[in-house]
């Protein structure tokens, strides 16, 4: 059995700047029998924050074959001030335990993209979701 994860994001979108602020992530996880609930929730929380960082902040650009960002002053992963409220529900199960390593990472970006569409009608389809991308989608 694979690990199943669902995610819903609550966002605010600034229509002028295109900035997206994630207020809350809610994740529901079915990973079979959970042996250590606190550890499982911590793993899901960390993975969801990694997914959030990749969805909104992380992305490498290259100029003339060289990386544009060579240090953390210009390459901006998720910062503590951008961490939203996170709610995690672990589904009860009698199935064998399965991995929690990365599954929660993959559902965050689609949840944010759908939340942006629900909030303002802008459909974004590329990562990372930058303010310029949201502004462009709003104009479309």
Where are these regions (language model features)?
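C-terminal catalytic domains of large/alpha subunits in multi-subunit enzymes
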Residues: 1-140
């Amino acid at each position: 059995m694979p690990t199943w994860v669902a995610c819903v994001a609550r966002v605010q979108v600034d229509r002028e700047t295109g900035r997206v602020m994630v207020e809350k992530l809610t994740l529901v996880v079915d990973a079979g029998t959970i042996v250590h609930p606190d550890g499982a929730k911590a793993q899901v929380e960390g993975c969801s924050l990694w997914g959030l960082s990749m969805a909104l902040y992380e992305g490498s650009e290259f100029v003339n074959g060289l990386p544009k960002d060579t240090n953390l002053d210009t390459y901006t992963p998720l910062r503590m001030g951008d961490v939203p409220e996170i709610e995690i529900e672990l589904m009860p199960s009698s199935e064998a335990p399965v991995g929690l390593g990365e599954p929660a990472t993959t559902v965050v970006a689609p949840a944010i993209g759908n939340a942006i569409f629900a909030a303002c009608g802008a459909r974004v389809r590329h990562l990372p979701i930058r303010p310029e991308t949201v502004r462009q989608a709003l104009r479309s």
